[in-house]
Amino acid sequence: MMPLRYSKLNVFAGFPLFLRLNLFTMSKVNIGLVQMSCTGNKEENLKKALAKTKEAATKGAQIVCLQELFTSLYFCDVEDYENFKLAEAIPGPSTDALSAVAKEMGVVIIASLFEKRTQGIYHNTTAVIDADGSYLGKYRKMHIPDDPAYYEKFYFTPGDLGYKVFKTKFATLGVLICWDQWYPEAARITSLMGAEILFYPTAIGWATSQDEATNTEQYNAWQTIQRSHAVANGVHVVSVNRVGLEQNGSMKFWGGSFVSNPFGTFIYKASHEDEETTVVEIDTAKTDSYRTHWPFLRDRRIDSYQPITKRFIDEE
């Protein structure tokens, strides 16, 4: 059976209203993950992402998530003022192109872009576009790293929009970005705001000069922390990473995009090596069952958490 699309609404015009509403409020949602490699050509990367989004939609995807900063190489490996030229307004040219595809294919699109807010203020931002092509808004990355080969503080102002959820045609989405995934507070707040699914567009990899044991440890930690957010909050988690060699071969982005259910079980896991455009079905109706069997939200002691707002709890 082909998935229902925005563009097909007229087919059901003769149905009673309650039946039409029921058809489009089903709890099973098809998630498209686009794991791809990038080049130094922004236009080619965008064209490739649009094609893969269409491919995912053709396979039945209703929500498609692209990786972090998908229109370029991961440029934050160096501090170079020339890279600011890669930024654009949001909404802007890329979101316009994505909106056209969203409307054509009837899919929601989650798109991570380098945002130029104004002169001298830039953000790492994800735009969300609904299945009718309408721009729903954006989330600006809150946690900005500054590590070797990840010099994001040089480029990005920390997000100032707070944590956000987006009510799309198919589900209520929470969107966080890469380094945000290491912080349980971000996942918790977004889940408490009503997110049914947490999405993490990501750009992470390992240095090719680093030993295999360390690389494996880091990769396992990356999976574990995100799966723990799924468990602690009773939500599905979707993480979409880039793949391929960059930085003149010194950095291998490890792919490994995945979907986890609210018990932390992998529903899907991509390879380390290959580009993949995959569609995974999840059932958001099961959230209540997960949360009642493991009632972590019920048992939270919100009266005792004030110390979490401190940088460190010093001895009095």
PLM feature spans:
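Short hydrophobic alpha-helical segments enriched in small aliphatic residues
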Residues: 11-13
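Short, glycine-anchored, charge-dense loop/turn motifs used at functional sites
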Residues: 31, 129-136, 260-267
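Cys-nucleophile CN-hydrolase/nitrilase-fold catalytic domain and related Cys-dependent amidase chemistry
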Residues: 42, 51-132, 136-138, 204-228, ...
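Active-site catalytic loop in hydrolytic enzyme cores
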Residues: 87-90, 100, 117-225, 293-294
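A short C-terminal boundary segment appended to hydrolase-like catalytic domains
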Residues: 285-316
